[in-house]
């Protein structure tokens, strides 16, 4: 099995976010917001089109590609996710993690997403 090159990883990462979303995620990380975590507005929602898994993200460390948000796998939990791992994931059908194009940026809080 061929490993993913750095160029492929960057291209896959670009597919996860629109430029405006990436800028907003990084801006929120740089602000180091001290507000209640569950009241942070979600910038982007990622999902596994072939099974379980959604990630509602509020901020992104651009140096490490570690994002913060609500992960919904077996349980819903707040925490960090390595986007390099998400971009390298391929399902049994060869599908990768995708961005929910219809999710409204900065409209829902993490608490709203927990209730869904």
Enumerate the language-model features and the residues they cover.
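Catalytic phosphate/metal-binding cores of nucleic-acid and nucleotide-processing enzymes, i.e., regions
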Residues: 2-116
């Amino acid at each position: 099995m061929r490993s993913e090159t750095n160029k492929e990883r960057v291209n896959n990462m670009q597919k996860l976010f629109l430029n405006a979303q990436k800028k907003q995620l990084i801006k929120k990380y740089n602000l180091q917001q001290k507000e209640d975590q569950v009241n942070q507005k979600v910038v982007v929602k990622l999902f596994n089109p072939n099974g379980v898994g959604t990630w509602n993200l509020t901020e992104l460390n651009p140096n490490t590609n570690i994002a913060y948000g609500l992960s919904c796998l077996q349980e819903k939990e707040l925490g960090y996710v390595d986007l390099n791992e998400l971009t390298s994931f391929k399902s049994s059908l060869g599908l990768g993690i995708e961005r929910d194009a219809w999710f409204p940026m900065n409209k829902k809080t993490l608490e709203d997403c927990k209730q869904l």
